[in-house]
Amino acid sequence: MMSFNDYIFYEYLKKTNWNIHNLYCNLTQTADNILNFEIPSGVSCQLSSLTSSNFASGCKISAMPILNGSMSYVYTNVNLENLNRNITYNLQHFYEGYKHVDVPFVHYVNEFQDKKLPLRPTLLYGRMHLPSQHLDAIFATRLSPWLLFFIQGVNEIEDGVGDNLCFNWQYDTGKRCLEFVYESSGAMLGVRGLWNLNYRELNTKINMENKAPSNMRWSLGFETYYGVLTKCAGASLGMRLHSGPSHPYAPFILTCTLNPIVGHITSTFSTAEPRTKAFSAQYDFNIYSYESQLKLGIELWRSKQEMSQSTNDPTANSMSSLLKGTCSTSGDVSISWQARIRNFLLTIGTEAQLTKIDPLFFGVHFEYSK
């Protein structure tokens, strides 16, 4: 389940019209959400509040095996007042699972003015962990309709290594998206890129008027990085095929990534029936060692009809609970149940290794937002 702070950052990007699906780092986002969901650690409770249209705060307490906590604050000059009634109204807003790929968006010069956004939409985030005094911070800003720049900082006071800063610069034109990354700890430089191959067909007015958009969309991308201090390098190639809005059957996403250095190939297939169920499969294969693994995941949604707060009339169905499960040929099994109970979001999960004599891992997470 998406945390409250992640939800605020996601809404910031959404309201500033930034397409997160056009990034190479999110190429396999849907499969990762279904197959690699997080199991709560021990028992944790989180309280969050959107105190104004621009400011949010939260605190978290965790127990078992050790007692710790954190305090966080988020500020943005983007108006978030419409989130007040959505935060606890629908589990769908915090749902991390099948996310279909958005249509590539064409940015233009007066985009911020037309959407009544600030000239430089900005977000500030800070979190302090107790008692470790570990600090996290994020500064994000839209330099232009085509550019997003953000800095992530980590400070470990008890660690002698010192601070670690990650600078990320993203440039999105719709047809392609480039991402440049620099990390200070290892002086690592990285470049990512993603190209939409049938972009012209999807966005040319003449083609849109004369024929329907293609039911299939192709994307190709790459990633490469090099650590100046660590002398380590890496690279990967990837492709994505997904259904378009006029696809007559269930939506799907097919991806394939290759790491040529270690010879690792990963392919995923995800599909869903909206607001009912979702399925994902991942197959890993190494061309050097011939090792392979198959992983399957499923989601089952339960929805109920909500009543409009203003007219008391029935509205569209909203997600009230979600059951997720995964299994793999290596014997890993994970199960998670997420539900909304009034203003509380509840997550219960467990995971086990069937081929080893290991104890079950179990966790419970409560979150209250207002």
From Swiss-Prot:
Can you list the GO cellular component terms from the UniProt entry?
A: ERMES complex; mitochondrion; SAM complex
Q: Which family does it belong to?
A: Belongs to the MDM10 family.
Task: State the membrane topology.
Answer: Multi-pass membrane protein
Q: Which HAMAP family does this one have? A: Mdm10
Supply the alphabetized keyword list: Membrane, Mitochondrion, Mitochondrion outer membrane, Transmembrane, Transmembrane beta strand
Location(s) in or outside the cell? Mitochondrion outer membrane
SS bond list: none
**What does the entry's domain section say?**
Lacks alpha-helical transmembrane segments, suggesting that it resides in the membrane via beta-sheet conformations similar to those predicted for other outer membrane proteins and porin.
The processes (GO biological process) annotated in the record are:
establishment of mitochondrion localization; intermembrane phospholipid transfer; mitochondrial genome maintenance; mitochondrial outer membrane translocase complex assembly; mitochondrion-endoplasmic reticulum membrane tethering; phospholipid transport; protein insertion into mitochondrial outer membrane
**Assembly and binders:** Component of the ER-mitochondria encounter structure (ERMES) or MDM complex, composed of mmm1, mdm10, mdm12 and mdm34. Associates with the mitochondrial outer membrane sorting assembly machinery SAM(core) complex.
What job does this protein perform?
Component of the ERMES/MDM complex, which serves as a molecular tether to connect the endoplasmic reticulum and mitochondria. Components of this complex are involved in the control of mitochondrial shape and protein biogenesis and may function in phospholipid exchange. mdm10 is involved in the late assembly steps of the general translocase of the mitochondrial outer membrane (TOM complex). Functions in the tom40-specific route of the assembly of outer membrane beta-barrel proteins, including the association of tom40 with the receptor tom22 and small TOM proteins.
Pfam families, per database record: MDM10 (PF12519)
Where is this chain primarily localised? mitochondrion
Q: Which molecular-function annotation in GO is an example for this chain?
A: phospholipid transfer activity
Q: What is this protein called?
A: Mitochondrial distribution and morphology protein 10
PANTHER family given in the database record: MITOCHONDRIAL DISTRIBUTION AND MORPHOLOGY PROTEIN 10
